[in-house]
Amino acid sequence: MCCAVCGPEPGRIGEVTPLGPCPAQHRGGPLRPSELAQASVMAALCAVTAIISVVVPFAAGLALLGTVPTGLLAYRYRLRVLAAATVAAGMIAFLIAGLGGFMGVVHSAYIGGLTGIVKRRGRGTPTVVVSSLIGGFVFGAAMVGMLAAMVRLRHLIFKVMTANVDGIAATLARMHMQGAAADVKRYFAEGLQYWPWVLLGYFNIGIMIVSLIGWWALSRLLERMRGIPDVHKLDPPPGDDVDALIGPVPVRLDKVRFRYPRAGQDALREVSLDVRAGEHLAIIGANGSGKTTLMLILAGRAPTSGTVDRPGTVGLGKLGGTAVVLQHPESQVLGTRVADDVVWGLPLGTTADVGRLLSEVGLEALAERDTGSLSGGELQRLALAAALAREPAMLIADEVTTMVDQQGRDALLAVLSGLTQRHRTALVHITHYDNEADSADRTLSLSDSPDNTDMVHTAAMPAPVIGVDQPQHAPALELVGVGHEYASGTPWAKTALRDINFVVEQGDGVLIHGGNGSGKSTLAWIMAGLTIPTTGACLLDGRPTHEQVGAVALSFQAARLQLMRSRVDLEVASAAGFSASEQDRVAAALTVVGLDPALGARRIDQLSGGQMRRVVLAGLLARAPRALILDEPLAGLDAASQRGLLRLLEDLRRARGLTVVVVSHDFAGMEELCPRTLHLRDGVLESAAASEAGGMS
C-alpha cells in the first residue's frame, strides 16, 4: 500500500491520505533507498515469471504474471523505478533463460507499465485499449522492419514455422482428417505471402488482449490492497522529503489518540508525553495497549486527534533524524555482507566508521560475513549498528529482545546500556522485560489495569530430561537418527541437526530448549512433516510425517505470517478445512481457545499478538491433529498473555490428551505444560551434564 502523510507545517504532523500513488514531489532526483528496495523485489518477481515461462514446457502463459509487479511499480512510483527494475530483471532473465527470458521481461515491463500509468492517472478500460493498440502497432512495425532487413533470419524463422505446421498437418492426416490438414497448410502458405500484415495484426490483437488481462489483474490487486488496513506504515511526512530542518526531539505529544481505518475503537487511547533529548524512556504495557502505535506516531505517523510538536521534521532514516529498530530484524537487514548493511541507504558521500560501530555491537569479527548466516541476536545487533550509523537524534527500539535467546538478549542490553551518553541520542525502548525497563530514566505505562502492568521475568534453566526409555503410552512421534543439512552437496552446505533420537508419547508435553541458531525451528518443521530430513526419519504411527502433512500441526513463531485471510472467521474456517458459512463450527473453534465467538467478524489486523496466536490455534485444533508443535509461542507476548496462553495449552493437554511440543529459548512458566525438557545446542541433543555445564558458563 502507499499511504502518504501530508502536513504543510514543519514541526506538525498532518493528515493521512488514502491509498494511492506516491506524491509528485518525489519525481526528481536519484533512486531513494525505498525505491531501490521496491525495484529489486519486483525485478526478482518479474524475472522469475519470465524464466519459468521459458524453461518449463507449456508454461508460457505464466509470463502474464510478470505484468503485475511491473504494473504495481508503474502505479506507485516514478518511471525510472520501473526502468531500473526492468534492466535488473532483464539481465537476470537473459543470463538464465537467454533471449526468450529477456523478451518476456520487456513485454511484462511494457504492458505492466502501460496499465500502471493508466491506472495512476485515473483512466479506464478504453484508454488501455487505445494505448495497447498504438503500442501493438509500434511493436509490430518494428518487428516487420527488422525481418524485412534481416532476410536470412526471416527465412530461417519461416522454415521453422513451416516445419511445425507440416508436423501438425501430418498428425491431423493420421487422425483421418486429411481435409483439415490440407486447409492448415493452405492457410499458412497464404499467410506467409502477406506476412507483414499478419504480423501487425498479431501484435495489435495480442498486446491488446494481454494488456486487458494485466489491467484486470492490477485492478484486482489494488482493490484487495485497499481492503487491508494500513496498520504499520512508516511513511514520513512530505516535509521530511525536502531540505527542511531535521529535529525529532524534544517532542511533545498532547492528548494524542489514534484509530486505524475502519476500526471500531482507538488503538491508542489519549496520551500526553514528552521525550527529551538524550534521555532513555521505557514504554511498557499489555498486548493491544498501543505501544507500537505510539512508536509509529513518534516515528512520524499522524494521530487521529491531538497534537505532536517538535522543533523540526521527523527525519525518519535520515542523518540526525529518527531511527527505528523493529523486533524482526530480517525485515531491516538488506545488505548481503555485514559491513555493507551498516551503510546501506546512507546518502552518497556520507562517511561512517563501520569498524567502530560493529565493535560497539560486538560484531567486529563478522564484518565480511554473509548476513544470511547470522543468528537472530546477531541480526538484531546489526540492525542496531545500521541505525546508529545515521547518528539519530532519537532511536526507537520496538521489542528488540523479543525474538532472541538469553545470550543474545544480554548482548543487546549491553549495547543499549549507556547508548544515550555515547551517542547523544534519545532512546525510546518498548519492552516486556522487567530488567530492561528498570534501566530507563523514565517509564511510561500504557495499561490502566494493574494486572496488565506486570512484566515478563527470566527464569533458571530447567533440568534436562532426555532419556528415551520405553514409553508407558503409545508413541506419538518418534525421531530416529534425524539429521539435516541445508544446501547439501554444495559449497554452501550447512548442517542444522545431527543424529537426533527421542520419542514423544501420546499426551506428553515436551519442551525443546535452545538458543538462536541451535536448530530448533528446523526440528519443528521436520516433526510437522514440512521438511524432509537429510538423514534418519521422523515417524508418526510408523510412517514418515512428511507423508501425512497436517496430522502434526505447527504454530509458527510469527503468528501473523500464518494468518492468510482478512477476517477471523474466514481464517479459522480455511485452516480447519470447512466452509466459513458454518458459523457454529467457527464459534466452537474460537470458544475452545478462549476467544469470544463475536471476534469472528473482526479483521485480522485489528487483533493483538495474543489474540493472533489463539486464532492460529483455533484453526489448527479444529482439524483434530495428533500432535501440536509450537515454535516460540511466548515471543512478543506480555506477562498476562503468556500466562493465559500457557493455561489454555495446559487445559487442552489434560482434557484432550493432546501431545504438545514447545520449541523455545524461553522456559519461564513451562513446567506444567512441558514436564519433560530436551536441550539442543548446535544441532545436537545434549546430555544432562553437558547442558548444566553450558548453562553455568
UniProtKB/Swiss-Prot annotation:
Binding, ATP 1: 285-292
Transmembrane regions listed in the UniProt entry: 45-65, 86-106, 128-148, 198-218, 280-300, 522-542
GO cellular component terms attached to this protein's record: ATP-binding cassette (ABC) transporter complex; peptidoglycan-based cell wall; plasma membrane
Name recorded for this polypeptide: Uncharacterized ABC transporter ATP-binding protein Rv2326c
Places the protein is found: Cell membrane
Residues that, per the record, bind ATP 2: 514-521
Upper lineage: Bacteria, Bacillati, Actinomycetota, Actinomycetes, Mycobacteriales
Natural source organism: Mycobacterium tuberculosis (strain ATCC 25618 / H37Rv)
Domain ABC transporter: 251-473, 477-696
Family note: Belongs to the ABC transporter superfamily.
Membrane topology according to the record: Multi-pass membrane protein
UniProt KW keywords: ATP-binding, Cell membrane, Membrane, Nucleotide-binding, Repeat, Transmembrane, Transmembrane helix, Transport
Molecular functions (GO terms): ATP binding; ATP hydrolysis activity; ATPase-coupled transmembrane transporter activity
